């Protein structure tokens, strides 16, 4: 029996692209994404979409969220450190570029108080444990041997996965200080496949993955 995994990469505001692709799946194929996949994984901006699908939020609503609140999420904070040449390094170390409170507000409006323990679909949201120098993978409580995250609010897990260093502040969840899952799994497909095999006992040959990226930024280089 085929085990279908949906994996969504990180990529900041470019998350609108996989959200739009999934919107086309819904409209052109007439499918419900939550019912069409057996496991969902997302990193960074992909975690917003993955968690949304796991909560049975339509992709069209996720597209609207990016368009309406993208500017709020990527809202540059006003620096409290006076700008001087010698303070540039200090600013980079002590202040994130964007206001994490704005991201928190948007995620709260989307996910409210839903907890990972409320989700029945296998959900994988990678983050990075910068306090202990390791990986941290949030999971819904689909495995009775893995109940660590059942009381964690989805918005907290998503914010941790989204908190790219220098762009957003690290996010604390319980005793863990967490940052962007893209530091080690910007494409979470492999993490999902491994979990399906080890946790659920799915044979490798039975696994099919739909992995959606966020494209690439075009950067122009020139002489200084």
Predicted regions: what is each one?
Residues 2-7, 12-107, 142, 147, ...:
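Patatin-like phospholipase
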Residues 5-8, 38-44, 123-128, 207-219:
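Extended hydrophobic secondary-structure segments that form protein cores and membrane-embedded regions
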Residues 13, 93, 117-198:
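Active-site gating loop/helix substructures
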Residues 29-34, 108-123, 198-203:
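Surface-exposed acidic, glycine-flexible loop patches that form ligand/cofactor-binding
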Residues 52-53, 188, 219-223:
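A short acidic (Asp/Glu
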Residues 77-79, 221-224:
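Short aromatic-enriched loop/helix-cap "lid" or pocket-rim segments at secondary-structure transitions
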Residues 91, 96-122, 186, 208, ...:
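Surface cap/lid and interfacial helix-loop subdomains adjacent to catalytic sites
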Residues 175, 193-223:
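Hydrophobic, mid-to-C-terminal alpha-helical segments
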């Amino acid at each position: 029996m085929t085990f279908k995994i949906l994996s969504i990469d990180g990529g900041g505001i470019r998350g609108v692209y996989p959200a739009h692709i999934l919107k086309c799946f819904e409209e052109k194929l007439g499918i419900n994404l939550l019912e069409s996949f057996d496991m969902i994984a997302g990193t960074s901006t992909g975690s917003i979409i993955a968690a949304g699908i796991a909560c049975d939020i339509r992709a069209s609503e996720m597209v609207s969220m990016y368009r309406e609140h993208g500017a709020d999420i990527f809202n540059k904070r006003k620096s409290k450190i006076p700008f001087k040449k010698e303070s540039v390094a200090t600013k980079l170390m002590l202040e994130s570029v964007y206001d994490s409170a704005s991201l928190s507000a948007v995620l709260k409006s989307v996910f409210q108080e839903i907890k990972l323990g409320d989700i029945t679909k296998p959900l994988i949201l990678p983050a990075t444990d910068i306090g202990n120098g390791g990986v941290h993978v949030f999971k819904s409580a689909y495995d009775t041997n893995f109940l660590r995250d059942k009381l964690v609010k989805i918005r907290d897990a998503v914010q941790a996965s989204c908190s790219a260093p220098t762009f957003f502040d690290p996010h604390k969840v319980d005793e863990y200080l967490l940052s962007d899952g893209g530091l080690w799994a910007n494409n979470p497909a492999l993490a999902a496949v491994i979990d399906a095999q080890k946790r659920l006992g799915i044979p490798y040959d039975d696994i099919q993955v739909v992995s959606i990226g966020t494209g690439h930024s075009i950067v122009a280089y020139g002489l200084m």
